Amino acid sequence: MITDLRFASRKLLKSPGFTSVVVITLALGIGANAAIFTLVRGVLIKPLVNRDEDRLIYIRQSAPGAGTENSTWSMPEIGDLKARVKSFSEFGDFSTISFTMIGLGEPREVNGGVVNGSYFEVMGLRPVLGRLIGPEDDGPKAAGVVVLTYRFWSNALYRDPSVIGKTANLGGVGGDRSATIIGVLEPCVPYPQETEIIANVASSPHHLSATMVTERVHRMTELFGRLAPGATLDQARVELRSVYAAMKKDHPEAYSKQADFQISAKRVRDQITSGARTVLLLLLAGAALVFVVACSNVANLILARTVRREGELAVRTALGASRSALRRMLLAESLLLCGAGAALGVLSAQWMVDVLARYASRFSVRALGLTIDSSLLWVGAALAIVAAVILAFVPRLPNDTSGALHSSSGSVRLTGSKGRQRIFVVTQIGASFVLLAGASMLVTALLALQRTKTGMDTRRVLAINVPAVFNGKTQEQVVDLYKEIIRRIEALPGVNKTAFGMIAPWRDAGTGPTLQFNAEGYVNAAGEEDPRTQFRVISPGFFAALGVPIIAGRDFNELDGRSEETVAIISETLARRMFPNQDPINRHVFWTDPVLKVTRVTPPKPQRIIGVAADIDDVHIVPEPTMTIYHSFEQGPLFRGRLFIHTSANPYSLITPVTRIIRGMSAEQPIERAGTLEDARAEVLSPQRLNSMVFGVFAAVALSIAVVGVAGVLAFSVSARTREFGIRLALGSQPQRLFRDVISEGAAMATAGIVAGAVFGFRPGACGAQLFRGCSDARRFAGVRLGVCAAYCRGDRINAAGSARSARRCYSSTTHRVILRTRNLLL
């Protein structure tokens, strides 16, 4: 075999054009598959770092009747489950809350997890530095302690080991607390949500409040459990349903029949990967199609090269070379080609993995921690071996009956090769058609999303996170600080309007509360519960700052203080639903959500409507009719601060002066994530862009390879039929007829490939249409058919023109003498 490899290397070096094309083609196919398999393995196959992950269960409460996929749990509900369910040895709870953290580097707003003392033991996680939160850190009298996540420790604190033992001030809902950094968590999947820090309950005043501890409807906590020894998941599910049914019976006021509260349990691993499984398998299928196209194209090139080497093979056979020796020689060449292609493909796959990990993080948080390991190498090697074996057995040897070499007048043809080449071409066309159809659907969906009007002036609005920092301040003092910030920023050149809100559109999607309410004069239908609406706290000028018109009434003003009448502004959709054919101005709305009755985070009395504003959907990229009630920041609680600046200048030129103004007023004030609303929207659209880019690149590569493959087959066919074309010209056939023959041969292969692609690609297309919003598979398939046909017909025309020129040259050369003899014999 060593001798064969040496001979093969010399042979390939003598054909640099052929070798380069084959290596690059294989590198594209192998690299794409190696990168995507690494992604699939990292997200779907690779074990979690959690100890005994198969016994780690995620317990979810949902309310499908209210459109709530995950309603989370309240502490009384968790207490009932802990007391009654015996299938779990222990439970761990996790809730998410926003903190302003001061004292650990720059002031910043962090997303924090709040856990009980058994959480890390249940999750089976370990520290890389210090220790984790344990039972000794439980209870309201415990000292505040914090564990840093590995990503935050690495990116924000540069892996500084001296942070252990330092104290930070955590400000949030309910007040401020100091907490000591006690450890750094090992790299792990950030589920249920990515956080920067994880604190004990004593670090969050809100979690110590009576509302959090005693109210059954105050739901904000995720629940995990570890199966008890000998217990199975099915047994745990049965017990959970039984206990949950008893809980609903004992507390009917907390479980609305219309909301249809339900309980479910799933292994944490399955829960983490469920959203990514379908899209990753589609991605893997797309990469497999690219590999098929690449191998088919290389097979065609090898077949054409074998025909040119048929004399050599015949001589070797005549000199006694066995079929196994010939096949071994071909295998040596294939191994060298595929090995070089795999090496180049693995190198290119390394940067592809980083891009694909960001893409997959939309569907599974596990992709955030994806790293490149040895699997990339062995996948590339395995694909190279598979391709080498396939390609080595593609050519038929001289002794094959169906592919025997025939000689006639000094020319040779391989009768079996042409049929195989056509099969490979049809395969390439079909695969490229499926990929192109999928890419077309995704691009169409992306363009539709980008063209959607938001109702806001997104390009000229700068949004900056300026969260409320109390740290001993009262609500009135924070409001006064915000007012002064607005006044000073509006004095800057180019600033049109400045205001505060609590939600940055799209960037903070899902963090704003949705609450039940009712309106003066509105009567619920039989069995209808009170409707739900978004709740937002804003400053005067908010609508002008975002470029949103006030349709009726007025905006908030300085007179709408806490000592005055409680007022509200409502959205246009809410006005139409709650006050049909009526003027809502000076009517009243009031909150009825049971959560608000115990938390008292909104004014308890009815609010008089002073204005109606156009809808603002700050959650969805494609705006939907949205019911919203707005409170003035002087009359409502300050959950967080988002600064909006409407400018006629370049929005980003204001970041430095705005930062200087705010820091000059409050050195401890976090100032983060400055960017236009247009960029915030583009960030949300980035997964769709990656969808289009990934599948578009696959489709472009496959189509390019396939078009080259068709052109190669037709070129081979034309060169093999040069003598035939010359004779037909001599006998009176027109060049246009030869042109049509070549065109029809290519069109037949293209049609067969498109039909095969449409048949086998319809189901994946339907899946893609359901998975990616805005895709229409039927229309895209029709358009792609035309595009693929046009691409292949262009290649056919080039080869047809070449056939006519070849035939004319043949006619005017020595072949002309043969043609004259043939004509004389016929006469």
Feature annotation, model-predicted:
Residues P16-V43, P47, V293-S296, A342, ...:
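Short, strongly hydrophobic transmembrane alpha-helices
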